[in-house]
Amino acid sequence: MTILAIDTSNYTLGIALVQETKVVAEYITYLKKNHSVRAMPAVHALLNDCDLKPEDISKIVVAKGPGSYTGVRIGVTLAKTLAWSLNVPISSVSSLEALAANGRYFNGLISPLFDARRGQVYTGLYEYKDGLLHPVLPDRNVLLTEWLGMLKEKGQQVLFLGHDTAIHDQTIQDILAHQAVMGDAALHNPRPSELAYLGAEKEAEDVHQLVPDYLRLAEAEAKWIESQK
């Protein structure tokens, strides 16, 4: 089975090809560039480098958000288009879960984090048990201070992952002190190969029903809904 994994949900663009237990190819960049013009060429380049054709793909896995509204839409739309045109199954994985997978060797709780502005973050809580990643608290859009208060009550060390941890480093350290473990730079990019393996275990979804998971409405959408009340 050849799995194609696609993640454009944040600044990180990640494409991977995985066959069973082997990572055949993986492409990762962290650039403030438009994924809409780079994602598909990256898929083609990876397939060509591996002497594979689109028809060799057995399954597609996509990061469904949260993250950048535009980025999430680009990845989900691309993945759905490929799955439909190639007639292969598709599965989606939380972008936070994919990032949390980088904490495989951490003995404690894992909090992947994306900045959501105005003191808020997209985050969730995970941990590894017997080599498998498990959710402890569901993904959410929450005030960082509120989230840190919840983590403080758990009394365990927490590994924070994601480039946006740098924005909130001082607040995290002030509230959690020794409980907080800041991930190394190499762990802040979500790995599309990890995304592929997470998705390999998930059931296939209806390609027409699969939608992004933003965790909150875009500001413009929220204002429009409020105006209709």
Predicted regions and their residues:
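Residues at secondary-structure transition points
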Residues: 30-41, 69, 73, 77, ...
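Surface "functional belts" at beta-alpha junctions
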Residues: 22, 34, 89-188, 219
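Conserved hydrophobic/aromatic positions in well-ordered beta-strands
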Residues: 16, 122-126, 213
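Acyltransferase
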Residues: 181-229
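N-terminal beta-alpha supersecondary unit
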Residues: 1-66
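Short glycine-aspartate micro-motif
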Residues: 3-5, 61, 71, 110-113
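DPxDG-like acidic metal-binding loop motif
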Residues: 59-90, 95
